[in-house]
Structure formats: structure tokens, C-alpha cells
């Protein structure tokens, strides 16, 4: 009879432990009911890129001195810089500058080491095309600034309201490359 009593006691303890585990998991499940959804409806809602996001490269033709530092620091020698030497002023004249984003790894070395700051990273990350040759951007395409996600009224931006409270006017007045 003694082993039977200890068996009932063990069974009762296991039942109480199982009920406690189920209760704890149910409390965790209920704590998630008042949170915002994590997923977004992509084409209609976009998350705001962080300040140091490395998107498409923006190029300012007038600032470039054709020093080719960007080509030397690029791990895959990607930027193509065409220039000619002006003998009367003894300076390089930039003729053509292009980057093929089909091969670019968006490491940001070219932006960081540029002595004249003619290269900068933008928030643009939608570079998909049907033809890979369209990803080869010349100086005209690189010079276009992307439309800011924040300023576009057709797109609803997704902010994590529980962690960051951002004033929309403050975002529009900030001096980012996309708001010039």
C-alpha cells in the first residue's frame, strides 16, 4: 500500500507541475495580444531605414576629382572611372562614372574613403529589375536622389511606437541626403 500512496503523490505533483507550465505559457501568449503586428504589408507599408543603412550609392559629379580612391578600396574593383588629363590646367577631367549594382556588395568603402565626399549612401533598396543590364548606373542615374519614404503620402511607414516615438515634422526637417 505504501508504494501506491507514493505513486499517487508523484502523479499529483506531476499534474500540478504540468498545470503550472501550461499556465505560464498561456500567460506569455496573453502578453502578446496587445502588441502591434511584426509583419508588414510590403508594397503599402514600408519600414524606415536606419540612419546608417547602406542602400544605393548617390554620386555628385561636380565634386569628383577622378582620384580613383573608390576603385582602389572596392573589394571587387567595381566603380568604372573614365577621365582624361587636361594638360593646360594639369588636372584630371572626369568623363564618365558608373557602378554596376548587380555586382556591388554595398560595403560602403567607396563612400567612406572618398576624399571629396562625392559619394553617399541613400535609403533606396528597391533595385530589382527584369534585365540585369539596367543595374549598371552611370553618373546621371547615380545623381538622382530617391524619393524619401517618409515624405511619400501614398506609403504608410511602419514605426515601432513602443520603442521609438518620432515626431513626423522632425523627420521631414532632418538633413538627410533624401530630404535636400
UniProtKB/Swiss-Prot annotation:
Gene3D superfamilies cross-referenced by the UniProt entry: 3.30.70.3270
GO CC terms: chloroplast thylakoid membrane
Cofactor note: Binds 2 [4Fe-4S] clusters per subunit.
PROSITE patterns assigned to the protein according to its UniProt record, in alphabetical order: 4FE4S_FER_1, 4FE4S_FER_2
Transmembrane stretches, start-end: none
Binding site for [4Fe-4S] cluster 2: 74, 104, 107, 110
Protein name: NAD(P)H-quinone oxidoreductase subunit I, chloroplastic
Organism annotation: Dioscorea elephantipes (Elephant's foot yam)
Lineage start: Eukaryota, Viridiplantae, Streptophyta, Embryophyta, Tracheophyta
Gene from which this protein is expressed: ndhI
